[in-house]
Amino acid sequence: DEVITSVTTLTAQKAHEKGLEFLAHVAPGIPEVLLGDPLRLGQILTNFVNNAVKFTERGEIRIEIEQVERTGEKVQLKFSVRDTGIGMTKERAAKLFQPFMQADMSTTRKHGGTGLGLTVCRRVVELMGGQIWLDSEPGMGTTFTFTVWLSVGQQQGSGRVIPDRLTTIRALIVDDNAAAREIIDDLLKGVVGQADAVASAAEAIAAVKQADANAPY
């Protein structure tokens, strides 16, 4: 959480200034206390998010973190930064992690360089026992993904406690962004009794009116 908070603090304002949606999702089930190198993780994520903002004119930037594997007191996490930006061809994407490589000169002139070298990011990820790759398509956006191994730390106290009364609540999620609805729905799983999602205020009003009197929102 500290890493995500730091990254969003540094980058969210830039996204909002361009009118972009900025979303971050940490999947349920990840241990609350992890030991690793938060500075390096933060630098890599910040670099990827800044690049995503730079090369995206409309749409959204989305950070996703999920657990891939757990072996004893070690967990492998997967970090993804997705954008709806200009994207690139497979040929250019394959060269992007080479030293001093940019997608092409026209892109560099319009949007600027990619900040902290992607070659450096790859080396840092490999030092942390992980891998790094990207998926991209021209005009459809880019997703940078990397994995790292972290140690599970000792949790202080009993962790998050969910009051029993919340498990009987029926929640209604209202957001015009499908990705945001998905993230909020995932966060509410195991917290409230039921969560439904709609895309507009009109749909929300209709859902509230149609709700059973014995199970209101």
Feature locations, PLM:
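Short alpha-helical Gxxx[C/S/T] motif in the catalytic ATP-binding
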Residues: 112, 117, 121, 174
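Glycine-rich GHKL/ HATPase_c ATP-binding element in histidine kinases
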Residues: 140-142
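Glycine-rich G1-box
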Residues: 13, 86-87
